[in-house]
Amino acid sequence: MSGEEEKAADFYVRYYVGHKGKFGHEFLEFEFRPNGSLRYANNSNYKNDTMIRKEATVSESVLSELKRIIEDSEIMQEDDDNWPEPDKIGRQELEILYKNEHISFTTGKIGALADVNNSKDPDGLRSFYYLVQDLKCLVFSLIGLHFKIKPI
C-alpha cells in the first residue's frame, strides 16, 4: 500500500442518534468509509413509516472537505467524560478515525443549545454539537442531491 493509500485508509466517520420509544427503535445513522462510501439510514415507525437506507460514493474532494470540517471543529482534542450520559430520551454516538487518532463519543440527545451551555463541559459539548450540525447538513445535502437529480 502506498503512503497516499495508507493515509486514505486511515479515515472513517460514523454518527448515530436514536431512541427506543412508543414507535420502536427510531434512529438516524450515517458513515463515511475510506473508499468514499457514504451509508445513510433513517428509521422511524411513526405512521408505519419504513426504514430509509441510501448508499452513495463521494469524491475525494468531498472527503477532503469532510476532513477540513473535522479539523476546524477541533473535536479530536475533546473528551466526553463530563458530557451527559445517554438516557431514555436518547443517545448520540460519534466515531472518527483520522490521522492515526481514533475517538468515540457517546452522549445523550441534545435538544437545544441551552442544554450544551448548562452542561459540565460546555466548550467540549459545543464543539460536538456544531460538528454534528455541520455533518448532518452535509449528509442531507449529499443524499438529497444524489438521489433527486435526474440524468439527462
From Swiss-Prot:
Core component of the splicing-dependent multiprotein exon junction complex (EJC) deposited at splice junctions on mRNAs. Positively regulates the nuclear export of spliced mRNAs including the sex determination gene tra-2. Promotes oogenesis and represses germline masculinization and spermatogenesis. Required for embryonic development, possibly through positively regulating the expression of pie-1. Not required for the spatial patterning of pie-1 in embryos. Disruption phenotype: RNAi-mediated knockdown results in embryonic lethality due to developmental arrest during morphogenesis. RNAi-mediated knockdown in the syncytial gonads of adult hermaphrodites results in some inviable embryos and then eventually no egg laying. Belongs to the mago nashi family. This is Protein mago nashi homolog. Heterodimer with rnp-4/RBM8A. Part of the mRNA splicing-dependent exon junction complex (EJC) complex; the core complex contains CASC3, EIF4A3, mag-1/MAGOH and rnp-4/RBM8A. InterPro entries: Mago_nashi (IPR004023), Mago_nashi_sf (IPR036605). Keywords: Developmental protein, Differentiation, mRNA processing, mRNA splicing, mRNA transport, Nucleus, Oogenesis, Transport. GO terms for biological process: feminization of hermaphroditic germ-line; mRNA processing; mRNA transport; nuclear mRNA surveillance; oogenesis; positive regulation of egg-laying behavior; positive regulation of oogenesis; RNA splicing. Expressed in the soma and germline of hermaphrodites. It is found in: Nucleus. It comes from the Eukaryota. CDD domains: Mago_nashi. GO terms for cellular component: catalytic step 2 spliceosome; exon-exon junction complex. It comes from Caenorhabditis elegans.
